[in-house]
Amino acid sequence: MKSKRLIILSLVLFFYTISNAQKNQTSKTKKPNFLFVLVDDQPFDAVGYSGRYPFLKTPNIDWLNEEGANLENFFVTQSICSPSRASFLTGTYPHIHGVNQNNRHVDPKWDEFEPYSSHLQNAGYETAHVGKIHMAHLKGEDHIRPGFDYWFSFIGQGEYFDPQVNENGKEYKEQGYITDILTEKAISWLKEQRDENKPFSLNLWHKAVHQPHLPAPRHSDLYIEEQLPTPPHDTHKETFKGKPEWQRKKTFGFDWRKNLPIPLELPQMEWPINYDRNMDLLRCLSAIDESLGKVIKVLEEMGELDNTVIIYSSDNGYFMGEHTFLDKRLAYENSMRVPMLIRYPDLIKKKTKIKEQCLNIDLAPTILYLAGVEKPAYMQGESMLGLLKGGNDQNWRESILFEYFQDSYWPYAGPSQIAVRTERYKLVDAFLANDIDELYDLKNDPGEMINLINEPDYDTIEQWLRDEATKLKVQYRYNPNRDWWLKEVLKSKRKL
């Protein structure tokens, strides 16, 4: 009898051990989920943790900064909505995927450059896109982009209040404030609509804080007693002395292409610059931060928080009076640099700081690597996994290539240009025969106020950067023809 009990007890212990081992193995091999929160036009330093705006409160964004990795030198390949979003999705440069300006006709060549979400679908993921897409203005089911099982979006910039939306091909008018609507849809999909047996990938891509920067009514009086602090490095004192003439013309108030006389140096503008609109942008961030907090809470309630890679970024930077500018597009730091925070406790230690230069085309390969999916050959970015682990990747890039194509809708914003940026230097070439280029020493002049392009002491550095530009253009197959894909699209439309 005693031996029988021992046998039974041994069997119970055996099966218990096997069961626990299987559970542990399952937890180790369980694929991570992905939550990608993308804000529109958020300056890299418009966050509470930066201290740039002492009154700014972003507790949930700050929590993400504490809990994961802050990629302090994260840049977009082109600083404008549509091109940057397409690059995030495809891992390719705008001159490759074809969306190199905000144009109502153009999508990426999806058949050649599938979004990372399509590869996740093939790997067993359930995927959703909630929010702005801002590519070709398509309607009905044509508006649904490849790679998503659930779709909730809108055409172009959309609207802040009571927006017209597209849900899985059905168009209707929603009621409320856009940030809240998108948050509710994302949470509804997480809790009620997805297959709980599958790993998921959710894009929550906000319209805010894009101009006209309309905050939620509950935040309209936020910070009303506060003053905008002057920018670091006194960049608001810009006079454009020694800088390209096209920038002085742009600032002076007429089309930079017009052959009109312009002073060699402009008077300093009084601070604050664009006070009302910039304060409203900061107010818009409150609803964004609340949204992030709500989704994080839902993930925690679902037991999926620590198994979800949370990514927070912006499609481009934004000028808040630096160099007297508003908007983005140009090759200044405030335009091309964006916040990038990533949390994944299984891999990333708390308070990780990454100094290396990373690009928006690096995100898609990184997501695929974490999901156990091989990077397709067309993706030009690199997995950031080694950096996220806290390692020192000796083979990581030493320079980046930035590009801008003159926008057909906003031609006065600036000419087509490229920039090469290293840890210390930046060269900007606007391809203008009758104007000068730009060269900045980012170590000694982080505000990019002193153009060194005509300084003989920097001739060797200038040539090195031009050689680097040539190398990068070959590496990334740079195509200066802005309209190559647009012409194909419009030609095909004429045939219909």
Regions found by a protein language model. Give the residues of each.
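Bacterial Sec-dependent N-terminal signal peptides
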Residues: 1-29
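Loop/turn elements at helix/coil->beta-strand transitions in domains of secreted/extracellular proteins
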Residues: 30-35, 67-72, 122-128, 146-150, ...
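C-terminal cap/loop subdomain of S1 sulfatases and analogous C-terminal strand-loop tails that border
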Residues: 23, 135, 145-150, 155, ...
